[in-house]
Amino acid sequence: MNVSVVTERRTPAYSSLAAGELNGLVARALLTEARLTPKPGLVDIRNSGAHRDMDLAAFERSTTAIAPWMEKFFIMGNNTAALAAENVLVMLRPLGMACENDMLQATNGVNTHRGAIFAFGLLSAAIGRLLARGEPLEQNRICDQVARLSRNIVAHELSAKKAGKLTKSETHFQCYGLSGARGEAESGFRTVRTQALPVFNRVVQEHDDTHLALLQTLLHLMAWNDDTNLVSRGGLEGLYYVQQQAQKLLWQGGVLVEGGIEAMQSLDDELILRNLSPGGSADLLAVTWFLSHFPAGSLYPE
């Protein structure tokens, strides 16, 4: 079965953005990612991937619950723009916890979007800060603000030795050196900017097909992102297996060649059998789509 979903074309780049518009753009990013099909090991229209406790309807309910919170992150970033960015993160945490609570209520306790709340909460606050400062909304400026908001988050939250049992995130970092979502945020979404966005833009330009561009970008993320969701489910062996399989498909041309979609479906079936789900890469794909709506801007913003 060849599953294909037509996704909307990108809108013109945003030069400005009202708080209410932000809610809608984030919702579209999350729904575009969720409905993209086929996605190996992930919830999509075809199946629920390696997840027995969630489906596409749960992701849609979750998106409806959390999207309105992006305006609140935006306002907090806007109102605290005069403060040093690293002092704002503590003010964003209560919003994140409340947003997560609404997500859990909408999904009957299932974690559908915790990583996305973290990523898009920071992105929304970063946009609020930039607009308050009269700075243009550009990919690199937005990501630079995210990096500033997240400064030293890995050292503070993952590397410190604590009494008692380590969390999964602490274990991933202290045992394997994997910093997960926190490290990606602290880097200003380096993986998205240096790998995902260039692939996405190239495929859109060459093929005029957002659906293919997103699938090819997902393969690149699966191939090179050290996804701690995979480590949680399958250890380093699971991570390396997914990376190797994605790299193999890319060497063959990915979804841009005949049989590419079918190969993605076969990999989906295999990851379901192995109970592997690259959820971190899915979050970064949604971030990629979101950021693609803004101009790139200068590489080193002032």
Swiss-Prot record:
<dbReference type="GO" id="GO:0005524">
    <property type="term" value="F:ATP binding"/>
</dbReference>
<keyword id="KW-0808">Transferase</keyword>
<dbReference type="GO" id="GO:0046917">
    <property type="term" value="F:triphosphoribosyl-dephospho-CoA synthase activity"/>
</dbReference>
<keyword id="KW-0067">ATP-binding</keyword>
<keyword id="KW-0547">Nucleotide-binding</keyword>
<dbReference type="InterPro" id="IPR017551">
    <property type="entry name" value="TriPribosyl-deP-CoA_syn_CitG"/>
</dbReference>
<dbReference type="GO" id="GO:0051191">
    <property type="term" value="P:prosthetic group biosynthetic process"/>
</dbReference>
<protein>
    <recommendedName>
        <fullName>Probable 2-(5''-triphosphoribosyl)-3'-dephosphocoenzyme-A synthase 1</fullName>
        <ecNumber>2.4.2.52</ecNumber>
    </recommendedName>
</protein>
<comment type="similarity">
    <text>Belongs to the CitG/MdcB family.</text>
</comment>
<dbReference type="Pfam" id="PF01874">
    <property type="entry name" value="CitG"/>
</dbReference>
<dbReference type="InterPro" id="IPR002736">
    <property type="entry name" value="CitG"/>
</dbReference>
